[in-house]
Amino acid sequence: MINFNYETEFSLDNEQAFTDWLSAVIVSEEKNEGEINYIFCDDEYLHKINVEYLNHDTLTDIISFDYTVGNEISGDIFVSVERVEDNAKDFNVSFEEELKRVLAHGILHYCGYKDKSDADAELMRSKEDEKIAMFHVEQ
């Protein structure tokens, strides 16, 4: 089950479309969907988590806590809407595209993808692009 929680004024326009897409992303990686909680927040909220739990005194766009067991992926994914907005501007993409990238990024970590080395980051980026292309909304 995928849940969306809001600790900021932001909210997704079409939660069902995002849920369907993220579920498809999980299936495409041959994983089972457990309980995944997305928590949308601001920089201050996520910075506190970054300092308290990871001992990193920096801003970030996403922090994920992985509770995956075997093939069933579960976890809490915190997303700073402010960072996503700034990154979208920095990368010259729409807010929605950058948001999809971040949402997929969290799932991909749970599927075992890493991004610390250049090679891993390149694979992660490729997987993000692949998963973003899977998103569609029925018109």
Swiss-Prot record:
EC number: 3.1.-.-
Residues involved in Zn(2+) binding: 105, 109, 115
Positions of disulphide bridges: none
Domain of life, per lineage: Bacteria
Key words of the record: Cytoplasm, Endonuclease, Hydrolase, Metal-binding, Nuclease, Ribosome biogenesis, rRNA processing, Zinc
Gene name for this UniProt entry: ybeY
Protein name in the entry: Endoribonuclease YbeY
Keyword hit for Hydrolase: yes
PANTHER family assigned to the protein according to its UniProt record, in alphabetical order: ENDORIBONUCLEASE YBEY, CHLOROPLASTIC
GO biological process: rRNA processing
Cofactor note: Binds 1 zinc ion.
Molecular function terms from GO: metalloendopeptidase activity; RNA endonuclease activity; zinc ion binding
Family affiliation: Belongs to the endoribonuclease YbeY family.
